[in-house]
Amino acid sequence: MIGQKAWVNIGKTEFILLLVVGILTIINVLTADGEKRTFHSPKKKNINHLTLYDCVSPEVQNSINETGRVTNFF
């Protein structure tokens, strides 16, 4: 779900907290951390490499739904 918080389990960016900013397929999502990976250059991640939390950021979700973009993270 867009705006959902995720923890990276596998890869170079292991142990980093991210936000889901887009959904590509059933398996792949676009993620951003607000520093290295911003909304304008998100990273494609396999959801099997993420731990998805039930917590969804309503600010991010509303901003993406209303304007199609996000200006700030965390």
From Swiss-Prot:
Q: What is this protein called?
A: Putative ribosome-binding protein YbzG
Organism in which the protein naturally occurs: Bacillus subtilis (strain 168)
